[in-house]
Amino acid sequence: MTARLLALLLLLAPLPAAAEIVLPTGFSTHVYVTGEGFDTDSGRGARGIPSTSTIAFDGTGALYLARTGRRYGGGEAYDLWPIYRIPPGGARVTPETERRFLHGPPLSNPQVAGTRRGKEILVTTFDRERKVGALYRMADGRAELLAGGTPPRGTPALFQQPEGAAVDAEGNVYVTDRAQNVVVRLDGDGRVVDPRYLAVTRPRLLATDDKGQVWVASDGAAEAPFQQGPGEIVRIDPTGTSSVVHRGSVVAAIGVSPGGHLFVADRHERQIFVLTQDGRRVAFASFTDNDAPRSLGFAPVTPETQRAGVAGDLFIVRIKAGTWIVNEVLRISGPFDELIRGR
């Protein structure tokens, strides 16, 4: 009995992330979500869950992930999957236990795009052949169409390939459409406010901050986000004025910390940096041993996340040792905003 209990405690204990990530003094990291049995190369047997490139939290501290699948594969390649919901505390997933973490209905090429009011998960989907995309809001596992979808006959689709989504303090919803080279602005009910809020080549990622600014990362000439680019990050201020604040390799993910700082994951340079208001880069983390960041997001600060012990922590989807087919989620804790203010 004692041996079984000890084995269970060891199984549930967080794993150290080893030396594949280099962090500033005062920060710690652990593996938060991992898995076994998903690597198709039985000889390699890499740990991790099926590849995922989008991540978001609700106000309770539950983590949502979506499979990357063959979203950029072209041709007839597409995927129909539910998203994952990981309860506070993390998880170790296997093919036998995967079902308990699946959340909501199967959707076509889903991406966890963001959250709203701490309760609703915004999910984008698209059908490559029909060139029709949709934005869903998901609550309690039920998906409800918010905008887009199949239009009336003779009417062009609002979205063709929606990717990121974000909500500002006034409740407006912003959606990137990578195929149509625009960012669309919606009201809280999904009605179109501005179909061309921003015109930019292959926009993919979105974030908003408490200053009323909208941040958009685009892929530029890269046909797929795993290509080098170059890409760029545009900041739109509350007056609607846009400015390019960063040019470089295509970034994998962006996310705003609870203190309002924009963190950027650069897969090609294998690092995470902070982008200041004037476009200055502040180094935060670097990866070794052929590891790289694939996505990132911060847990919100709420009474529930504080009780769960994850409030304000940074979570990173990691590609380990160049193995794209499976990924792990790392949790990083530390004084993020104090570090940036000190730089």
Question: What is the role of each PLM region?
Answer:
Residues 74-75, 79-85, 133-136, 181-185, ...:
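A short loop-to-beta-strand structural motif that recurs across blades of beta-propeller domains
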Residues 68-70, 125-128, 178-179, 219-221, ...:
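Short loop/turn segments immediately following the C-termini of beta-strands
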Residues 17-30:
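Blade/loop signatures of beta-propeller domains
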Residues 38-60, 102-120, 152-170, 200-213, ...:
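Beta-rich, blade/repeat-based domains predominating
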Residues 86-91, 138-142, 186-191, 236-241, ...:
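Short loop/turn segments that connect beta-strands within beta-propeller blades
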